[in-house]
Amino acid sequence: LQLCRGRIGLNVEIKPSAATPALEAETVRLLREYGFDSSNCVITSQSYETLHKVKELAPEYPTGYILALGVGNYYDLPDADFFSVETTFITSGMVNAVHLRGKTVSAWTIDREKVATHMLELGVDDLITDKPDMVQDLLARNQQVDDSLIDFRDLLNALLHPEQPADSSDDAEETITDAVEDPEEFVDAA
């Protein structure tokens, strides 16, 4: 915890057993001692009872219910702020149902770019991966596309709703024609 403090956020998974009855309390104590709070730490577990204990001890920490199977009626569980679901069970309907309740979906384990892209298309909020470089590269490329689309939208708005004299309409028409005929070149130029 000392090495992580100030460098990265944590997703702490609690795996309770009969031999560790105070595991939730000890986990919360250590997180607080090392300066981890709700801004840089979430607590997850496959045990809903564990999440309930954490919320009683430290309601400020976001808690995630880890679901090996993304089926059932779990959306309204009060002690789960988000759901961590294996990618096979994530559907757009499930993501929408969770989002309608003001909660989020984390997908695990993302180790292929194709799977990461699919999860982003479904609207998941977080990608849990063993290959952070791959996910960072994908997110950076997606951001570049988003920025280009925003620039394109702004340019089209400026062309379609000019605040300049009407004599600039020939230029606007030519620019729109160029964009329609060769959108990739137009976006690259923007």
Task: Name every feature range the model reports, one short phrase each.
Residues 178-180:
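Intrinsically disordered, low-complexity repeat segments enriched in small/polar residues
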Residues 2-170, 182-189:
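Short loop-to-alpha-helix "cap/lid" segments that border enzyme active sites
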